[in-house]
Amino acid sequence: MAVLLRGLVGTDTQSYIDIIGLIDKDIDASVEIGFYLTTKVLLLLTNDALVITKILAIWMFVNFGLFFSKNKERIYIYTLLVMPLFFFDMYMNGLRYGVAYSFAILAYDQQIKKNNLRFLILIALAISFHISSIILIALLFANYLRNINGKSLFIIAAIVGAFTFFFKDRILLKLMQYSSIESPGALSGIMPLLIFILTVGLVVVSAKKQSVLFLMCVLCFAEILSFIMSRYSYMGMRIQFIIILVLFCKLPELIYFRLQAFLVMFFISLLCFTGRYRNMADEFGNGPSPFMPYHYYWEVK
């Protein structure tokens, strides 16, 4: 309800309203093709840009629900970890990457079920909404790299190569946009790094099997690189949160859900919530659509 009843709430909400306005005028707006086409369809139903952002948020909510409602362990993860860290950011702010990541984790589920057609469709949808979903997809399947053969490697290289060729202009544009955004501050990347370290600690004390070692090494290496990058560019911090989301999604496969695990998760949950709240409080009243103070849609002037 907080998402549906909100007015201009969320740092990027006004930016999305402006983007939707450009799309309504048939202007490219420098967004991914999936988001562009979806917005064009939604504009046939309503010309209220704020309503369109809420429809996208509902779509995202349904996708995440389909993934995390599969078993009780995933429900625990969604409630204790995903919601405190990502709820406000995705549902009320970063709609494009939120929808993209929701498609990416659904694709992961379909690949586990060996449903290759649905997997490819969902991968295409994820990438068409936000280019950074490629990183999420790659890390979700990182533990399969140990068993990859030459044929699979060739297919992956061909798909990545074809995608890069056809969308090279958009990829370069995104890289330029992110690289131009400087690190928010001296402590940038510290909060996601701390959350990652605590979650790795959770895996260490509650791991189901030794085979998690390879995946954890890959994620730790990626986290170190992205943390270093976050000192200089916003892109690094974005990748840090992608890595955390991957780790959260994989936890039901990695750990036993015993009392000690729940205690650690509860502590991480508090850290996630307080970190997000501090960021919102620091931006109180700043910009055209800050998170705080919260207001309802009928209060929009």
Describe these PLM feature segments.
Residues 87-89, 118-142, 222-229:
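Membrane-interface alpha helices of multi-pass inner-membrane proteins
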Residues 154-159, 257-274:
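Signature aromatic-anchored transmembrane alpha helix within multi-pass, membrane-resident enzymes
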Residues 45-59:
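Loop-to-helix entry region of an early transmembrane alpha helix in multi-pass inner-membrane enzymes
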Residues 65-85:
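Transmembrane-helix signature of polytopic, membrane-embedded enzymes
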Residues 104-118:
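Membrane-interface transmembrane helices that cradle and orient dolichyl/undecaprenyl
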Residues 1-10, 268-275:
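Transmembrane signal-anchor helices characteristic of membrane glycosylation enzymes that use polyprenol
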Residues 9, 13-36, 136-247, 275-300:
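Alpha-helical transmembrane segments and terminal signal-anchor/GPI-anchor hydrophobic tails
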Residues 92-98:
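Short acidic/glycine- and proline-prone juxtamembrane loop motifs at membrane-interface regions
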